[in-house]
Amino acid sequence: MSPAKVDVTKKADPKAKALKAAKAVKSGQIVKKPAKKIRTKVTFHRPKTLTVPRKPKYPKISATPRNKLDHYQILKYPLTTESAMKKIEDNNTLVFIVDIRADKKKIKDAVKKMYDIQTKKVNTLIRPDGTKKAYVRLTPDYDALDVANKIGII
């Protein structure tokens, strides 16, 4: 078996190859690689990329959250101790046991909605047994004794 004959004419002339490459560079067909970026800082900060907002096919939570504290849950019951009665008579103040999660604004709104009375201010404290007590001071145009009568404390 003799080795396969290589066609000598198929090999390109080096001079012709160089001329062809020079012509391509001049015409702009060959794109140069971008120059390497010179880093001057020691630390590398990852560049911010585009964050596309999520478009879920369905919500993660199927039921909408309901309000856990409505007005009836905020005010548990009025306090009818001797000291509470003294507050009603002397300071125009009603005393309630309220939900531990209720804040002063929620207590004020609950009293306004349930008893149709304006409150001047609300003071709260947490009792040693873990319940929250609210002192609801009424405005001068409301009498705490009449409101207590209407509620059924007295």
Curated annotation (Swiss-Prot):
GO terms for biological process: response to cold; response to high light intensity; response to oxidative stress; translation. GO terms for molecular function: mRNA binding; rRNA binding; structural constituent of ribosome. The keyword RNA-binding applies. The keyword Transport does not apply. SUPFAM superfamilies: Ribosomal proteins S24e, L23 and L15e (SSF54189). One of its GO terms (cellular component) is cytosol. Keywords: Ribonucleoprotein, Ribosomal protein, RNA-binding, rRNA-binding. PROSITE patterns: RIBOSOMAL_L23. It holds the Pfam family Ribosomal_L23eN. Belongs to the universal ribosomal protein uL23 family. Binds to a specific region on the 26S rRNA. HAMAP family: Ribosomal_uL23_A. This is Large ribosomal subunit protein uL23y. It comes from Arabidopsis thaliana (Mouse-ear cress). The gene is RPL23AB.
